[in-house]
């Protein structure tokens, strides 16, 4: 099995190095790592820090947004399976091997995660708070609120040939849209292991914390596309406390030791 990891990055060199460090510690190495630089600062020095990793860099001439950049990456992927990851998230050791085993009986696999708030000290992120993010993934429930974490998820390359690429028209909800399209006709499986560390800012400076008029517009587009009806627009943290979400809470194996990832950026 050849696994292509696709990472979109924009001016997050320290976090990107932590992700690559976590990949270098995996028990199963990917076939290729495609880093799409969305017209940010050069990542060539980052590639040089990890010469043993099969890194290819795509430099976009203008900032195209994360969905278009991700599409550029997956179109270049030549592996049998594609694994996605945001540049500020990272994997625990053994994640890739576990997902490779799970996809043997599926077309699309996604793991649970730990949602972690970090503070940065001397270029390294240290965890301040952490919360298990593990929920049942029944298709009808996923039509109401998506608990799919794209980072660390893996799917067979042919899905793009069958259902297309990521939809920039729904912007923030590209992952929810892709999940629903895939789950409708293909074998999608949740892996009950929190082997992905998902960075989330309590201060609300990332997309998952942001709620605004444009985000509501994208949510409405998603709803119209899939016939989802009126969807909740409450803050992410508030939604997780709703009774329906409490009902969906699931058991999961927690594997992260809570230690920060010290990359080669600060050892070089």
UniProtKB/Swiss-Prot annotation:
InterPro entries: Glyco_trans_2-like (IPR001173), Glycosyltransf_2 (IPR050834), Nucleotide-diphossugar_trans (IPR029044)
GO MF annotation terms: glycosyltransferase activity
Pfam family, one: Glycos_transf_2
Top-level taxon: Bacteria
CDD domains in alphabetical order: Glyco_tranf_GTA_type (cd00761)
EC number: 2.4.-.-
Keywords from the named record: Glycosyltransferase, Transferase
PANTHER family (UniProt xref): GLYCOSYLTRANSFERASE, GLYCOSYLTRANSFERASE 2-LIKE DOMAIN-CONTAINING PROTEIN
Family according to the record: Belongs to the glycosyltransferase 2 family.
Name of the protein described by the UniProt record: Uncharacterized glycosyltransferase YwdF
